[in-house]
Amino acid sequence: MTDHDERTFVMVKPDGVQRGLIGDIVTRLETKGLKMVGGKFMRIDEELAHEHYAEHEDKPFFDGLVSFITSGPVFAMVWEGADATRQVRQLMGATDAQDAAPGTIRGDYGNDLGHNLIHGSDHEDEGANEREIALFFDDDELVDWDRDASAWVYEDLADHD
Ligand code: IDP
Ligand code: MG
């Protein structure tokens, strides 16, 4: 039986919010069959930005990254589904939107390395999804619910023989 309850952290970055792309980005994840279990429209402060991007602290682009991510509101989310972390990364596309394949979120909407619209937990960094979820959400902000469509997304949940 496939595990359908992997959770991952996703965020529409300030450029995506300013460009009115929250809805389109949410739609991409919903139509893939993933299930939203948390969402928060918020402004990231300096301290949270430093924690969230701690792995990039020593990179030359770090200060610019912090100033970008705190420059306007973001839409932070938690999504659930089979292989959710890697599935979201595939939908996002390559980090540099100029290299991201058409059909991906960054490939279709972006044209820049820094302004690349969406963050998703790194599936190659063990536990990054859980760490990032805990950084942005309290347990009681996450909603357990059954998505009826899941039975039509995952064959092993179906009623038919
Ligand atoms: P990811 O968002 O695809 O996981 P990371 O390597 O984790 O990519 O980098 C985090 C974010 O930092 C990227 O999404 C991008 O906005 C920004 N970034 C990464 N590399 C550079 C760079 O070389 N110059 C400027 N910004 C960068
Ligand atoms: Mg990353």
From Swiss-Prot:
Catalytic activity as recorded in UniProt: a 2'-deoxyribonucleoside 5'-diphosphate + ATP = a 2'-deoxyribonucleoside 5'-triphosphate + ADP; a ribonucleoside 5'-diphosphate + ATP = a ribonucleoside 5'-triphosphate + ADP
Any one annotated GO CC term: cytoplasm
Gene Ontology biological process terms, A to Z: CTP biosynthetic process; GTP biosynthetic process; UTP biosynthetic process
Keyword list, A-Z: ATP-binding, Cytoplasm, Kinase, Magnesium, Metal-binding, Nucleotide metabolism, Nucleotide-binding, Phosphoprotein, Transferase
Residues at the active site: 119 (pros-phosphohistidine intermediate)
Cited function: Major role in the synthesis of nucleoside triphosphates other than ATP. The ATP gamma phosphate is transferred to the NDP beta phosphate via a ping-pong mechanism, using a phosphorylated active-site intermediate.
Protein name: Nucleoside diphosphate kinase
Species annotation: Halobacterium salinarum (strain ATCC 700922 / JCM 11081 / NRC-1)
Gene from which this protein is expressed: ndk
